[in-house]
Swiss-Prot record:
The lineage of its organism: Bacteria, Pseudomonadati, Thermodesulfobacteriota, Desulfuromonadia, Geobacterales. This is 2-dehydro-3-deoxyphosphooctonate aldolase. It catalyses: D-arabinose 5-phosphate + phosphoenolpyruvate + H2O = 3-deoxy-alpha-D-manno-2-octulosonate-8-phosphate + phosphate. It is found in: Cytoplasm. The keyword Transferase applies. It comes from Geotalea daltonii (strain DSM 22248 / JCM 15807 / FRC-32) (Geobacter daltonii). GO terms for biological process: keto-3-deoxy-D-manno-octulosonic acid biosynthetic process.
Length: 272
């Protein structure tokens, strides 16, 4: 049985219904972030789906040094705190160094370990020692069964509030594929599993100076993943993906989200 974990007033795992983790790839500015969060709350209330709001304060692994990275730790956490307090929604963001754990834990309900950093023992342990829920994204270079050892690092601290996220595996150059077998294997760890449906259609570095993406496949992969009985779906969204400052090619347009969530919710109800 998969552990049930509390994130604010939301329950994920066990036999609970699907949870949405969504927001812009990066905090572009305060107004846009609040606007996106408010829209997501309205959409999720309309389809009765729990929401965890996500946004990055720093995109530390952008393809180019010239790419927009976000407002940084201090200003970014201020914006996420405002989202959390004004809307009453749990918030998630990713950390990149041990020094970020303490200030992040003061605001975030969920601390995320980026896929590229999931093997960094000291970072995983420090994040888990904060006592917050930890979402560990599976590296594009790892097999699903490799995550058993990563989970072991986190729970060695006594914090077993761990979530795992699948975001695809490298397939040749500038491409990712999603192996549906990964989900039941990851759930065998005993912890909730989320599918990152938008990063999984990313084409890393595919545009030369930035990553490309194939958002037209988000729905298909999302439907397939939900059919395996996963616990949550992760999607980066934007009011106008073509103008997004990060990961626009694989972000879902907010206008398209309600119809997609209804389909995913229907599949989730059948398999649980």
């Amino acid at each position: 049985m998969v552990k049930e974990i509390s994130v604010g007033n939301i329950k994920i795992g066990g036999d609970r219904p699907l949870v949405l983790v969504a927001g812009p790839c990066v905090i572009e500015n305060e107004a846009a972030t609040l606007r996106c969060a408010e829209r997501l709350m309205t959409i999720c209330n309309g389809v009765s789906m729990p929401l965890i709001f996500k946004a990055s304060y720093d995109k530390a692994n952008r393809t180019s040094v010239n790419s927009f990275r976000g407002p940084g730790l201090k200003d970014g956490l201020k914006i996420l705190k405002k989202v959390k307090e004004s809307l009453g929604v749990p918030v998630l963001s990713d950390i990149h160094s041990i020094e970020q754990v303490e200030p992040a834990a003061e605001v975030l309900d969920v601390i995320q370990i980026p896929a590229f950093l999931c093997r960094q023992t000291d970072l995983v342990v420090a994040a888990a020692m904060s006592g917050r829920v930890i979402n560990i994204k599976k590296g594009q270079f790892l097999a699903p069964w490799d995550m058993e050892n990563v989970v072991g690092k986190a729970v060695s601290t006594g914090n077993d509030n761990v979530i795992l996220t699948e975001r695809g595996v490298s397939f040749g150059y500038n491409n990712l594929v999603s192996d549906m077998r990964s989900f039941p294997i990851l759930r065998q760890t005993g912890y909730p599993v989320i599918f990152d449906a938008t990063h999984s259609v990313q084409l890393p570095g595919g545009l030369g100076g930035s990553s490309g993406g194939q958002r037209e496949f988000v729905e298909y992969l999302g439907r397939a993943a939900v059919a395996t009985g996963i616990d949550g779906i992760f999607m980066e969204v934007h009011e106008d993906p073509e103008k997004a400052l990060c990961d626009g090619p694989n972000s879902v347009k907010l206008d398209d989200l309600p119809a997609l969530l209804k389909k995913l919710k229907a599949i989730d109800a059948i398999v649980k």
